[in-house]
Amino acid sequence: PFHVMIRLPPPGHLLTALVLFMLLIFYVDYRLPQSSTVSYGRSRITVDGGRPRIVVYNRVPKTASTTFTNAIAYDMFKENSFNVVHLNITKNRYVMSLRDQGDLVRNLTDWRERQPLFIHGHVAFIDFERFGLAPPIYINLIREPLERLLSHYYFLRYGDNYRVGLKRARAGNNETFDECISRSGHDCDPTQMWLQIPYFCGQHPFCSEIGSRQALEQAKRTLVDKYLIVGVSDRIRDTVAMLEATIPSFFRGALKHFDSLDETRAHLRNTRKKVPPSSQTLYLVHSTEVYKLEREFYDFALAHFDGLFKKATNGSGRAEDAVAMASQYHFEKIKPVNPYRTL
């Protein structure tokens, strides 16, 4: 008969080989997974590469955007290790050609040495996915439409507390908003309110059509589906808290920092003089179709933000709770003990 002889190593060598083999198994089972999963249970799970790479703040003019950008983004970039870039569009346009949109989204996506990136500028929403690229995180602030127009109207005449020595476009023109309305002036024309809807509607041609119901509905869809947080200018502290809670890699410590600012830095660009409109002016403006649509959008955005804020604070309404509240979920009944892995 045919016999197979198996030569075993000496007992000491066999024990050494067995120990080395067990160490290898331990390394593969426990060391390698740490690059992707840190912990289970009630603690957070962190994943390498999970940090957002791009945050886009397509800031609407006269909505406290300067306060937010300077007091939060430019103050926090060192502490949280991100880059800040301002997007400047020729002739202060807020819409771009399709070609420029494509160039922009590719440039931002490929600009790896400047990521993580916080980019801000006066530009209407641009859909990255339209060009086959992963979307960034979009954020924004909005303001009651007539208040925004009044702020812009008097800003052109009297400037603000941010760049005091700069002469504004209507400097020396002391006409009040009421007087402008009475003569149907250009600067107070209610069509000047048509701005927040186009900013959220996006780059489609119909978005710029003044009084377009289609633009309003598109703006609502974009706000809900494409934006992480859209706050309101008179609740900027709540907005900062929501951003810290949802994008901590960019905004960790932002609420505490905002609370530490003095009144001047916490409210940059206050228009130096504003005359409240009369009841007659309010009636005339509120009766226009443009105001009704812009106000509908504002109310929609405010209700959406309120809903998110209420959940984030568990109903307390305190900004601090949005940041400090523990996660309201955990993992359990995890099987097997050593996870299956696929390459």
Locations of regions flagged by a protein language model:
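Conserved aromatic-histidine-acidic binding/catalytic patches
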Residues: 56-60, 137, 227-235, 282-289
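Catalytic cores of eukaryotic secretory-pathway lumenal/extracellular enzymes that build
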Residues: 81, 98, 162, 274-278
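Signal-peptide-cleavage-adjacent N-terminal segments of secreted and extracellular proteins
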Residues: 35-109, 113-114
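Juxtamembrane interfacial secondary-structure elements that flank transmembrane helices
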Residues: 32-35, 76-79, 149, 153-157
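PAPS-dependent sulfotransferase catalytic domain
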Residues: 43, 88-141, 147-257
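N-terminal signal-anchor transmembrane helix specifying type II single-pass membrane topology
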Residues: 2-40
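PAPS-dependent sulfotransferase catalytic core
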Residues: 195, 202-208, 218-219, 253-341
